[in-house]
C-alpha cells in the first residue's frame, strides 16, 4: 500500500530513450503515472511528478549521423515530440528532465567522483558481447542465439531482445555490485512492497542476484556522446549512472539548491516497464546504497500493451498512433481505455474492437446515458432545478447511498495499490447501480401522482448527487469529462468537486440549475466503421506486401511431435448452463457435461460475442486436462476451443452425434 504518513508525494516514470517517435506504450506508462499524481493531489498531497528523456549513448550518436545532424539537434527534436504528446494527453507532470541539461550533467559528474573516491568504482578492462540497440553487454551464456565458425568459436549472436551483438573489448570503469548484494536482499525482505507486483521480485532474486552479481561496466570509450568522466575524458559515463540518477538530479541533488531533494526524496513510487525492472531494482538501489541515500519506497513494474500478433512493429502494420485516437475519439476515450482495459502490472492486448466497445458501452451507454437521463428528468419534472436533499425517502435511497459508500472505500484501496483497472471497474459498478436505481424508482410513474412529489424529488437529488460523486472519482483518470458533468449539473462551487466531498451526501445546494439541454459527452460510434478505420490506420505504416496476402495467415508457430500433441486431452462436452461472471466484462461461466457423472465448470472469455442462452445445448470441444486455474474467484477446469477471425471469436462446435466425453483425435 502506498505510504500515507507525509503530505508530499514523489512519483516518476522512466526517462524515455528518444531513438524514435513516442507511441502508445510511452503514453500508457505516463498516463498511469498521471492518474496516480492526480489522485494524490485530489487527496491533498503536494505532488511532484517527474518524466523526461534519456539522451546519451551510441544509438543516439548513430541515428544523428544517419540524419546528418548533430546529436543535440537530434535529441532536441525527439524530446520535443515527447513533450508535445504529454501536452496532448494533458499529463500533469511537474518537471521534464533531459540528461543533456547542465543541471543533470553537473550532478552526475559529482556522483561519479564520489563513487570513485570511496572505492565503489574502479578502472579495469571489459570484454563482452555488446548490443548497440539495447546498449547493454551480455555474457555468452546470456545470449539468446550464438553464431559459431567452422572451428566452433563463437563469432556473434543475438541478445535476449533479438538484437545482434558484437564482441567489444575496451577499458572501462566498473561498479562493485557484489559488495551490496546481501544488503539488497535484506532490503527486499524487510520491505516487501519495494518491488511490485510480487512476481517481479522473485524474478530479480532467482535470475540475477542468486547466480551472483558481476561488477557493472559504468563507462564507455567506443563513443563520445555522453557525459565525460571527470579527470579521464576519453571515457563517457554509461547509462547506469547517467540515466538512473535523473530521479535525484531533477530534484537538485548534490547542488547548492537541494530544497526539492530534501523535500521529496525518497520517491514514493517509481513506475517502469517490466523490461527495465532489473535496472531499477538492482543497479539503482545499489547505487543509492553506495551514496548513502534512502531507497524509493516502491518500484512498480507494469506489463506491455501488445497486439494480436505480438509487440508493435511497423513491419507488422500494427502500430497504434495515440495522436490518431485522440484526434478522432477524444482524449478521455484513450485515457479511459488504457487504464480500464489492462490490469496494471500485467500485459494487455490492444484491439480496435475492444477500444470501440469501451467507448460505446462504458462511456456512451453507461455514463453518458446516466447524465443525459438525469438532466432531462430534472428539467422535465422540476423546471431544471435540483430539489433540496431530504435524506432517504424512497425504499431504494439508503441502498444506493450504502452502495456509494462501499464503492468509495474499495476504490481508494485499489488506487493506493496502483490497481487502476480495478478502481475503474468499481466506479463503473456505481454507475451501473445508479442506472438501476432509475429503473427501481420509476420516476416517470412517480411524476403521475402528486402525492409522490416528495419521492420524485428525492430520486432527482440522489441521481444528481451520485453523478457529482462519480465525476469526482473520475478526475484522476479523465481530464475533461468530470468538468462537463459538473457543468451540465450546474455545479460551480469548488468544494463540490473536492475529494472530501465524496464522503458525505446531499451536498448540492437546493435550486442548483442544470443545463436546459444536455449534450452527449460521448457520442455513440458506428462500431464496424470505426473498427475498420483504426485497422486501416494501423496498417498505414506497414511496408507494401511482396504479394497479395492469403485469406488465412500462414502459421509461424514451431512444429511439434505427435508425442507432444498426445499430451492434450480433447473431449466433446455439452453446454448445460451459462452465466455471466460478475465484474468481468468478457467472461462466461459454463457448466459442461463431459460424461463424467457430474458437471464441470469452465470459464471462457467470449462474453462479448455470445449471449448465454445462445450456447446452451451446443456440443463444444474442451481441453480437459488443463491445470485448473482460478479466475475472478471462480475455478476453471479446462478450456473451450474457439476460432478467431477479424478479432471475433467463434466457439468450435462438435457433431451432435458424438456422445458427451468423446475423445477428439
From Swiss-Prot:
Family matches, as PANTHER family: METHIONINE--TRNA LIGASE, MITOCHONDRIAL, METHIONYL-TRNA SYNTHETASE
Source species of the chain: Listeria monocytogenes serotype 4b (strain F2365)
GO molecular function: ATP binding; methionine-tRNA ligase activity; tRNA binding
UniProt-recorded name of the protein: Methionine--tRNA ligase
Reaction catalysis annotation: tRNA(Met) + L-methionine + ATP = L-methionyl-tRNA(Met) + AMP + diphosphate
One GO location term (cellular component): cytoplasm
The keyword Nucleotide-binding is annotated on this UniProt entry: yes
Annotated family: Belongs to the class-I aminoacyl-tRNA synthetase family. MetG type 2B subfamily.
Summary of the function given for this chain in its UniProt record: Is required not only for elongation of protein synthesis but also for the initiation of all mRNA translation through initiator tRNA(fMet) aminoacylation.
A biological process term (GO) from this entry: methionyl-tRNA aminoacylation
Annotated binding of ATP, by residue: 314
